[in-house]
Regions:
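Short amphipathic alpha-helical face segments that pack within enzyme cores
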Residues: 38-41, 77, 98
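Phosphate-handling active-site elements
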Residues: 48-55, 84-93
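N-terminal beta-alpha supersecondary unit
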Residues: 1-64
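Generic, well-ordered alpha-helical segments
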Residues: 31, 35-38, 70-74, 92
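Glycine-rich nucleotide phosphate-binding loop and flanking beta-alpha elements
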Residues: 12, 68, 117-119
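Surface "functional belts" at beta-alpha junctions
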Residues: 22, 34, 89-132
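DPxDG-like acidic metal-binding loop motif
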Residues: 59-90
Length: 132
């Protein structure tokens, strides 16, 4: 499948392109408050680098939160606009579920994502499955 993946839930602003289920390019910038300015350019450049049209995509995956409210709105708006324009399925991807995929631990544990100041988003997991 040809999938465009968009990340905007945190300070990371980025996108990845998967062609035939293989990651062919990833472009991300770890800098706060640049999503509105940079994310459309990142997506444009990814597609341009691989001579792709939006209509050639079979799905658009986008981080669905929790995370930065403004970042999520920007990422979701871009993804939804592209999906609607190309009549392509939109695939929401929960942020905590993705972070949990990198953990191989049994028992109960928490996945945390910095929110702002001294606040975090958290979700409890039990042996890899959501527990809250």
């Amino acid at each position: 499948m040809n999938i465009l993946a968009i990340e905007s839930a945190s300070t990371i602003c980025g996108a990845a392109l998967f062609l035939d289920n293989k990651l062919v390019e990833l472009d991300e910038i770890n800098q706060p408050r640049i999503h509105g300015e940079r994310l459309p350019l990142v997506v444009h450049d990814l597609l341009l680098n691989h001579s792709m049209q939006v209509t050639e995509l079979e799905g658009i995956a986008v981080s669905s939160g929790p995370g930065s409210y403004t970042g999520l709105r920007i990422g979701m708006s871009l993804a939804k606009g592209l999906a609607m324009a190309g009549n392509i399925p939109l695939i929401p991807v929960p942020t905590m579920e993705v972070m949990n995929r990198s953990i191989s631990q049994n028992g109960v544990y928490w996945v945390l994502l910095h929110s702002h100041k001294n606040m975090v988003f958290s979700q409890r997991f039990n042996s890899g499955k959501p527990d809250s």
